């Protein structure tokens, strides 16, 4: 997992808003990494329309290295 790497949204672990649910299957680019509580890592993914979402590692499929 690297900043700038392309990813596909696989699913969401939590209940999500409809506008986020439509992103499942979309391809985005990793723009940042955020650490929560020193154990949980979230990935900031940006899409073509410049929307950014925080996703967990297991919710993503990494497309290139």
UniProtKB/Swiss-Prot annotation:
Protein name: Uncharacterized protein ORF65
GO cellular component, one term: chloroplast
Cellular compartments annotated: Plastid, Chloroplast
Lineage: Eukaryota, Rhodophyta, Bangiophyceae, Bangiales, Bangiaceae
Keywords of this entry: Chloroplast, Plastid
Pfam family, one: Tsr0524-like
């Amino acid at each position: 997992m690297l900043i700038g790497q392309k990813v596909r949204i696989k699913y969401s672990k939590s209940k999500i808003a409809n506008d986020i649910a439509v992103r499942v299957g979309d391809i985005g680019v990793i723009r940042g990494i955020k650490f929560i509580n020193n154990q949980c890592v979230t990935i900031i993914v940006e899409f073509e329309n410049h929307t950014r979402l925080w996703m967990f590692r297991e919710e993503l499929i990494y497309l290139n290295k």
